[in-house]
């Protein structure tokens, strides 16, 4: 989507990762200061990256923050999504189906702001219903399906008796399905499962995955419009700080169709 928007406006899209910033401090900021780019969209700001924001503003480059954990940043146009509230909605859906022992497997380690936000949303939903949260219900995966598989295996090995699992994203949920199946636990008959993102493959999982649709394409389009407005010296019509809540998508993996209250 960003590529198409850039092409339509005669711009080139440059993708730069900040994963190695700890080894090469300031390299990304130096790229900005070199004036090699005309505008910048930062996706999923990490907690560790926040120290760069003031330096980026000082460079005078049009800037938009996009993704989770950006709404508390002042004086920068942001297109965010309330990942905490979205996780709360997902967990509340599982609770509405009769589940109280709901485990959570994150999509990454704690350095990502969205990891903490989704965990807080999951926890808030449980505590609002008077459910005491067991720390043993939480595991941390690391982006890919295999890590979700291993994290779910660790949960199962603890014998904490969870009847539902909220996965931090759909890819983690795919790994969880395999681990649950290998342990003889059927989804959703024995363990209900919720994902997050609604990636294209989610509808084709076995069983089809219930999830939260975050609409990154639409939000990315709005973020691009915010950036173009700055680059052209005009004002974007929408709010300079816009936040969305993901949409609940109910398929088979959560067990809603079973009408079973445990």
Predicted regions and their residues:
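Amphipathic helical "hinge" segments at domain boundaries
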Residues: 1-39, 108, 119-120, 124-127
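Short, solvent-exposed amphipathic alpha-helices that sit
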Residues: 1-8, 86-89, 113-132, 147, ...
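Flexible loop/hinge segments that line or gate small-molecule binding clefts
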Residues: 20-21, 42-89, 131, 171, ...
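Periplasmic-binding protein-like
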Residues: 36-44, 103-106, 138, 159-169, ...
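Hydrophobic alpha-helical segments within soluble ligand-binding/sensing domains
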Residues: 79-104, 120-124, 145-154, 173, ...
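An alpha-beta-alpha
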Residues: 88-129, 236, 240-254
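Short acidic capping loops at alpha-helix termini that bridge into adjacent secondary structure
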Residues: 100-101, 133-137, 187-192
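Flexible loop/turn connectors
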Residues: 151-262
């Amino acid at each position: 989507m960003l590529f198409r928007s850039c092409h339509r406006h005669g711009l080139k899209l440059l993708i730069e990762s900040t994963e190695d910033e700890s080894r090469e401090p300031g390299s990304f900021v130096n790229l900005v200061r070199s004036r090699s780019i005309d505008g910048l969209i930062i996706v999923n700001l990490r907690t560790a990256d926040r120290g760069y924001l003031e330096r980026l503003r000082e460079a005078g480059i049009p800037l938009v923050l996009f993704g989770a954990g950006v709404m508390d940043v002042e004086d920068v146009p942001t297109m965010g999504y309330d990942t905490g509230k979205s996780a709360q909605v997902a967990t509340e859906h599982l609770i509405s189906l009769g589940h109280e022992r709901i485990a959570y497997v994150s999509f990454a380690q704690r350095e990502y702001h969205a990891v903490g936000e989704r965990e807080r949303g999951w926890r808030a939903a449980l505590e609002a219903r008077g459910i005491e949260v067991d720390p043993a219900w939480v595991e941390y995966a690391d982006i890919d399906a295999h890590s979700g598989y291993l994290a779910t295996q660790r949960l199962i090995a603890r014998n904490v008796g969870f009847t539902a699992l909220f996965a931090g994203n759909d890819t983690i949920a795919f790994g969880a399905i395999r681990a649950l199946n290998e342990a003889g636990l059927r989804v959703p008959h024995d363990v209900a499962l919720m994902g997050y993102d609604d990636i294209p493959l989610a509808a084709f999982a076995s069983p089809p995955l219930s999830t939260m649709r975050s609409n990154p394409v639409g939000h990315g389009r709005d973020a691009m419009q915010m950036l173009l407005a700055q680059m052209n010296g005009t004002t974007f019509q929408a709010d300079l700080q816009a936040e969305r809540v993901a949409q609940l998508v109910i398929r088979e993996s959560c067990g809603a169709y079973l009408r079973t209250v445990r």
